[in-house]
A protein has these predicted regions:
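Active-site-proximal beta-strand elements of phosphoester/diester hydrolases
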Residues: 2-13, 119-120, 153-162, 181
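Hydrophobic residues at beta-strand termini and immediately following loops
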Residues: 8, 118, 148, 213, ...
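Cys-nucleophile CN-hydrolase/nitrilase-fold catalytic domain and related Cys-dependent amidase chemistry
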Residues: 17, 22, 26-112, 117-119, ...
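CN hydrolase (nitrilase-like) catalytic-core segments centered on the catalytic cysteine
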Residues: 62-85, 154, 163-252
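Active-site catalytic loop in hydrolytic enzyme cores
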Residues: 75, 92-175, 188-197, 201, ...
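Short beta-strand scaffold segments in enzyme catalytic cores
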Residues: 86-87, 100-104, 146-148, 232-234, ...
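A structural microfeature
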Residues: 112-116, 242-243, 254
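A conserved C-terminal secondary-structure "cap"
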Residues: 261-282
Length: 282
């Protein structure tokens, strides 16, 4: 079964939040017109990356998982017949905490789970992201991984920095994932061979396909500039690059055909997950 999957490589967001939402919606429609069944958007898809500033001024941007942004993209998923993965700034009314989170909607517009499909687990501070950016001042860390079903695939999500941790990939494989979506707001001059190669390695080691969506270009917030480097990518379960959108190609849709039926065959051939020494490793 071949399935068209898409990553929306969005331009850097502005302080005009309504305009940012419009850009993201247009990208989903564009991907759907090109035949995509699954569309991934970048980290903080409709907001500039504000973690270089104090959190106070930006709290008003946060929304509940069933708030206005969720309703808009639920309707958009149903309109386009695509599964949509939307990163957003979450305010959890039950706990009062704020999260860097992701919503998922099926092609019928129904939420793929009650609440977010992912909350960022690892919150960076220091050099990744660049110096001066502190996510721990803005967000509470998530405490669980989830796998949801859409378009015949079992899908997990690792938000940006979460991709750095091999245990997270292995845990998603253990939970039955076929595809891992990686929304990124990537900046700071990362080595592009490493950026893509790291995900290729995790894909091959675990027999997991990968769909990574990054922003590209400058974002201006709080007097600072965040320079997103693009390189959205689709990667097969064997680690092969199916599609890549480098920085110089700018904003646009990365589209790839994922052969879901090939994933079990890859796992039979590349037995790294099955051959691991569980008697030695937790």
């Amino acid at each position: 079964m071949s399935l068209a999957i898409a990553a929306a490589q969005l331009p850097g967001c502005t302080m005009d939040l309504a305009a940012n939402v419009g850009v993201a919606e247009a990208a989903v429609r564009d991907a759907a017109r090109r035949g995509a069944r699954i569309v991934a958007l970048p980290e903080m898809a409709t907001l500039p990356y504000f973690c270089g500033d104090a959190p106070g001024p930006y709290r008003a941007w946060a929304e509940a998982a069933d708030g206005p942004l969720a309703h808009r993209f639920s309707a958009l998923a149903a309109e386009t017949g695509t599964a949509v993965f939307l990163p957003f700034y979450e305010r959890d009314a039950a706990t009062g905490r704020y999260h860097n989170a992701v919503l998922g909607f099926g092609p019928d517009g129904v939420a793929l789970r009650r609440g977010p499909v992912a909350r960022k687990l690892h919150l960076p501070v220091g050099d990744d992201p660049p110096p001066g950016f502190d996510e721990r001042a803005h967000f509470a860390a998530g405490d669980a991984l989830h796998v949801v079903e859409a378009c015949g695939l079992r899908i997990g999500v690792l938000v940006c920095y979460d991709r750095r941790f091999p245990e997270a990939w292995r845990a998603l494989r253990r939970l039955g994932a076929d595809l891992v979506i990686v929304p990124v707001a990537g900046s700071g001059g990362d080595d592009m061979d490493f950026f893509v190669g790291e995900m290729r390695t995790h894909a091959r080691e675990n027999g997991l396909a990968v769909l990574c969506a990054n922003k590209v270009g400058d974002e201006y917030v709080g007097g600072g500039i965040v320079d997103n480097y693009g390189y959205s990518a689709a990667i097969g379960a064997d680690g092969a690059v199916l599609a890549l959108r480098p920085r110089q190609e700018g904003p646009g849709i990365l589209l790839a055909d994922l052969d879901a039926a090939a994933i079990p065959e890859v796992r039979r051939r590349l037995r790294y997950y099955d051959d691991r020494r569980q008697d030695l490793f937790a």
